[in-house]
Amino acid sequence: MSRPEHPGEQVEDGEHGVPPAGVAGPVHHAAPSPRYGRYAGLLALVILVLITINTLVTKPNGSTGIQPGNRLPAFAVPLALGSLNGAADVATAADQGAAGRVAACKERGPQILNICQLYEQGPVALALFVDAGSCPAVLGDLQALAPSFPGVRFAAVAIKGNRAQLRRLVASRGLSLPVGIDSDGALVALYKLASCPQVTFAYPGGIVQSRALLSRPSLATLRARLTQLVAAARARGWRGPPA
């Protein structure tokens, strides 16, 4: 995003349209590579995914996600359906070097998934996932329940995701919830990612409401957690639409 570029400066429409909420820079097309180069690139991608899954699932960092009572760490990432490129902006203020040149909460635009923008609008259910194996299945579950919780802001971020593959995932599962791309895996440490998927629930304003789900839950469990989130948010004064 703002590392290395500002998403708001160079915006091009994505080929499939853009959800309301993505990061920056022109897309440069490389010259065609030899056949074996393509296979090598594919193999590298497979290896990267396997390494990521191994890191997240078989060697957890001892974390259980962001603890209740703490605020969701700020981030802004490109949307999978957009055309903007760049690393996740995780800066908490301007000019923080590798974290970002612009504070993440200020990175706004139609091709940017900004967690601050989401929790300003209502309660949040955020899924972090790796696009491999059964991990992305939770996105279909969230999509299925979203109409029953109109005030909740559902979103997902793919760790080191591939845009073309994510677009196919969005299309195949009929997703309307925004899906972002964390191309360099910055959210792994920031969100204390311990499993795949990891689903975090937060009040309006970004304070985490309950412990994260660290595996794919049943639909009944997911519905119950969303119901609890809405009820707890109302108890704190939120006046969203009825579920």
Where in the sequence are the language-model features?
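Flexible, glycine-rich phosphate/dinucleotide-binding loops
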Residues: 84, 134, 163, 208, ...
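Short active-site neighborhood of thiol/selenol oxidoreductases, capturing the structured segment around
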Residues: 89-142
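Thiol/disulfide oxidoreductase modules built on the thioredoxin-like
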Residues: 121-122, 171-175, 183-233, 243
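Extracytoplasmic
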Residues: 70-72, 120-125, 154, 194
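Short, surface-exposed patches at the edges or C-terminal ends of soluble domains, predominantly
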Residues: 3, 50-62, 108, 141-148, ...
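Structural microenvironment flanking redox-active thiols in thiol-disulfide oxidoreductases
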Residues: 122-173, 183-188, 239-243
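N-terminal targeting signals for export/organelle localization
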Residues: 1-96, 239-241
